[in-house]
Structure formats: C-alpha cells, structure tokens
Amino acid sequence: MSEKQFYLLQVNDALFPIGGYSHSQGLETYIQRGIVHNVDTAREYITHKIKWNLAYTELLAARLAYEAAEKKDLQELLYLEELLEASRIPMEQREAARKMGSRFAKTIEKLGLSIGETGIFREYLDARKGKAVNHCCIYGVFCAEMQIPMEEALTHYLYAQTSAIVTNCVKTIPLSQTSGQQLLSGCYGEFDEILKDVMNRSEEDLCLSAPGFDIRGIQHEKLYSRLYMS
C-alpha cells in the first residue's frame, strides 16, 4: 500500500479535523418531526440521501473537480465553485461546505505535503484566497494532485459520507451501534450503481433537484433546539 493511499484514508477518516460531526445536513429536522424514528425509516432516509442528494451534489462535484484539476483547468475549478455556491439551496449547508473546505485546506497545508506549495492545488487555493472553498471540490483537487485514481477517491468519499450519515442516525434517533453497522453494510449494494451513475453524469446534473432534503435543510434553521449546525 502506497503512502498516497494512506493519505486517502486519512482525509476520509472521521477524525480528520474538518468538523463534519457538527452537521446533520437536515437529518435533525426529519428526526424532530418524527419522519425518521427507527431502523426502517433510517434505512429509507439513508438510501434516498446517498442516491438522490449526495450522489448529484458532493460526489458529482468531487468528480468534476478531480477532472478539472487533472487537466490543470483552473478556470473550470473556479466556475465549479461558483456553480455550487449558486445551486446549494439551504443556507446552513452552504456554510457547512465552506467551513469544512476551509478546514480541509488548513489541515493539508499543516501536514507539510509538497502539493501545498506548487501545482494546481496551490493555484486553486491562491485563486480562492478570501473566498470559500467547498469541501467536495478541494477533496477532488487534492486527490487529483496526489495522483490517487479517481475511482478510489470517489469510493472512499462515498463510504465516508455514508458512514457519517449512519453515525448521525445512531446518535440522534437513537439506534444501537449494531443497528448502525447493519445500516451501513446494507448500503454497500447501492454503492456500485451510485458510482457508475455519477461517472456518467455531466455538469448539467449537478445539484439535481431534491426538494424534500432542501426543505428540511431550510427548516433546520428555525428548529427550537438543535444538536447540529445544519
């Protein structure tokens, strides 16, 4: 196993300090309204979330960012950032993506990797100086600059994000740890289809409408009590 593969594991680890644990991406609204309240409803929520929301937003954006970085196309990366800013409707989720992207960049720079000094990764960060970077975009650029195969990068990202959703369900509904592991492993059969679909999508499909998730994300802003920032 090469060093770059260990870095891939590291940036997708739940302990990587980008603050992802602080965000439920609207799940908290579903739980407070009693829509997601047990294992069965959690399974339905997670399946729909990864197939119709995560796939066409973060996962597709990571792929597009990877491809643009691979071509050293800085203008395409900057356009993708602006497109995501305009297309992601819930305010809290836009802010979450910015914060996690900023923390990702700062952590990578402190690791002392050579990619933090030259190349498209540095050009991209310099061009976005004073502006936000989306977590999924900077992740794609990082993986391209590290020459991590795109399929591996997207697979690890999909697993990590799904695991985070399951963890939020376990903590907030709440569910048992065993139920959480069963929910997570139950998603594996969907992963191959999701990844194939994302590889066949274009920029026009980015942030494909998922109104239910958007509405719950917006409603989260007005919840009386909250454990999560989004």
Locate the predicted segments by residue.
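Internal, conserved structured core segments that host functional sites
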Residues: 59-64, 68-143
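A short glycine/serine-rich beta->alpha loop
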Residues: 8-17, 46-52, 86-93, 122-129, ...
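Short, contiguous, pocket-lining structural segments
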Residues: 17-18, 22, 54, 58-61, ...
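Glycine/small-residue-rich interface belts in oligomeric ring/scaffold proteins
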Residues: 4-72
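C-terminal auxiliary extensions adjacent to catalytic cores
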Residues: 160-230
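Inter-helical turn/loop segments and adjacent helix faces that build the functional surface
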Residues: 30-40, 111-118, 146-153, 172-179
